[in-house]
Amino acid sequence: MKHVDIFTDGACSGNPGPGGWGAVLRYGEVEKELCGGEAETTNNRMELMAAISALQALKSPCEVDLYTDSAYVKDGISKWIFGWKKNGWKTSDKKPVKNAELWQALEEARNRHKVTLHWVKGHAGHPENERADELARRGMEPFKKGKAVSF
């Protein structure tokens, strides 16, 4: 099974507001950068989209070390999701889980691989996390007010 390192980040200008996500995938010496964004979103949704998009980009099952600066993503997929599923996608106080469709997509993407999640401190000089942050900002740029969007 191939081993891939993935570094993800999300960004939002306003919360909610325009946002972007970025990911760096590394397999040996080969690297791939991904980014995207939305006009109206939240930082948590962008953090989730970064992880989902990166895992979905892998063409075959891989052993993955996924690095995120989002405790929300790390704790959600490794701790909270089990209770949410058991409770019919409701929180412990019976409210609908925010971003449930993204959590479900992340779980589906994760289940195709052997994923180990790692939390890294954001904006602390971690080179790959800084690159993922730059990509997230690049993904957000077309959606900021006054910017033209080209396709």
Swiss-Prot record:
Signal peptide: none annotated. Residues 1-141 form the RNase H type-1 domain. Its cofactor is Mg(2+). It catalyses: Endonucleolytic cleavage to 5'-phosphomonoester. Its EC number is 3.1.26.4. PROSITE patterns: RNASE_H_1. Mg(2+) 1 binds at residues 9, 47, 69. GO terms for biological process: DNA replication, removal of RNA primer. GO terms for cellular component: cytoplasm. Binds 1 Mg(2+) ion per subunit. May bind a second metal ion at a regulatory site, or after substrate binding. InterPro entries: RNase_H (IPR050092), RNaseH-like_sf (IPR012337), RNaseH_domain (IPR002156), RNaseH_sf (IPR036397), RNaseHI (IPR022892). Endonuclease that specifically degrades the RNA of RNA-DNA hybrids. Belongs to the RNase H family. This is Ribonuclease H. It comes from Rhizobium etli (strain ATCC 51251 / DSM 11541 / JCM 21823 / NBRC 15573 / CFN 42). The lineage of its organism: Bacteria, Pseudomonadati, Pseudomonadota, Alphaproteobacteria, Hyphomicrobiales.
